[in-house]
Amino acid sequence: MILKKTACALALTLFAVSGVHAVDPVTVVGWGGSWDKAYKDGVWDRYTASTGIPIVQEEWGGEVAKVRAQVQAGNVTYDLVSVEVPALEIGCAEGLFVPLTPEITGDAANYLPGTLHECGVASDTWATILVYNTDVFGDAGPASWADFWDVKKFPGKRGVNAQAQYTLENALMADGVKPADMYRVLRTPEGVDRAFAMLDGLRENIVWWSSIPQAIQNLDSGEVVMSDSYNARITSEVVEEKKPYRIAWQAGFFYGSDMWAVVKGAPHEGQALDLLKWFSIPDNQAGFSKLYAYGTGRREAAQLIPADWLANLPTAPQHLQYGMPYDDAFWTENKEALEERFKAWLAK
């Protein structure tokens, strides 16, 4: 009984002490849903177990205006945010995000192209890919974007993203432009005309989509036999729903990254930088990609992911030979004009 009372007293003392020295949580802002859950289960819970620092997750839509408003008002509530690269570029230039040093991120040479930024480290790496229905084509499905455009060899409607970005790249790959040469070609008026000419040739066989659920529904209903799409959602449909879809990685693809960035003047700016330093360790980055079919920024992290699951990720070494990063600088400079031309073309 004495031992039991002593143990209880000790536990209460420790609880009281821990209460006095409680550590404030770091507020991390992501994209919600299964993405946030994968980060919680694969990364943040491990960080809390390792450091004792709790993580509070919030969801947003990536609006840099929200960060700007908080910083300008001197009332920052976000510590670490996942943000798309164009918004990161704007925020970094405006001083809304904290510049990162190699002490935080590690050696830049260890990152895939496009996954490390002056103010950010890749929170995920996704790809736009060619997917087809194996119930229709079996193992003899399209293996290139030229095949995607070949409606005689592969009859049926195609699902295509209703925006210039992503679609123009696919059109030029169908016309023989290699991913490595893409933005040299797209930077010329002749290259843009060439992409739209390819779209002219496929137009009657296109079913346009403007959201991922719509793209999946088009495949599910049989309205289209193949589509462009995002790799993680297709993997989810195949692995969890057992749907008959296959990604043709060898067709060529472009990948992009969302970025973790620390908000300037964040209430826990130092802790957020420490968290980002911890996250930059390959094993910690791999925690997310083991649960969600987006890749990592660190090259070494791929070695820590089981081979059967790694095959679903755009950053798998066997897939990267066919992939290139999106040129974010090109799209920041040209997106408005190209999207306007694309909308006018759609309306014809």
Task: Tell where the protein language model's regions lie, with residue ranges.
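Early extracytoplasmic/lumenal segment of secretory-pathway proteins
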Residues: V23-I90
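Sec/Tat signal peptide C-region and signal peptidase I cleavage site
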Residues: K5, V17-A22
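Extracytoplasmic ligand-binding site segments that recognize negatively charged/polar headgroups
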Residues: G33-K40, V83-Q214, D220
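Mature extracytoplasmic/periplasmic domains
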Residues: F254, V263-G323
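Paired acidic/hydrophobic, glycine-rich loop segments that form the ligand-binding mouth/hinge
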Residues: N75-S82, W208-W209, V225-Y230, R246
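A ligand-binding cleft/hinge motif common to bilobed small-molecule-binding domains
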Residues: L88-I90, M226-K243
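Conserved C-terminal helix/tail region of periplasmic/extracytoplasmic solute-binding proteins
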Residues: H319-K348
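Periplasmic-binding protein-like
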Residues: W126, V192-G201, V239-K264
